[in-house]
Amino acid sequence: MERRIFVDAAPLELSPREFAVLELLMLRQGRVVSKVQLQEHLASFGHAIGEASHDVVGDTAIEVYVHRVRRKIEHSEAEIVTVRGFGYLLQARAPV
């Protein structure tokens, strides 16, 4: 199954793990997603695409994936906000 995300009608180029991070944030848009929830989602997503089930994604790797996704959606109407001590939140970008 092919999964795609579009920004302004253009497909967003994401690695499988970047896709998984953005997917979970989109599914829970407006709610804080913890690093543990992201780790669990990445593990189940990895299993679905054939990665070894023992692969654990650490906090630093999650921070890197979130940073990469932030850069890739920086021109969209959404932004990923860090909620210090809790996790991440996908929300509509505030008007400038």
Question: Model-predicted segments: where are they?
Answer:
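A structural micro-motif at secondary-structure boundaries
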Residues: 1-20, 32, 83, 89-96
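Alpha-helix C-capping/helix-to-loop hinge sites
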Residues: 5, 45-49
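DNA-recognition element of transcription regulators
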Residues: 13-23, 51-74, 84-88
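Short linear functional motifs in flexible/disordered or boundary regions
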Residues: 33-34, 50-51, 81
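Short, low-complexity, intrinsically disordered N-terminal peptides in bacterial proteins
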Residues: 49-52, 94-96
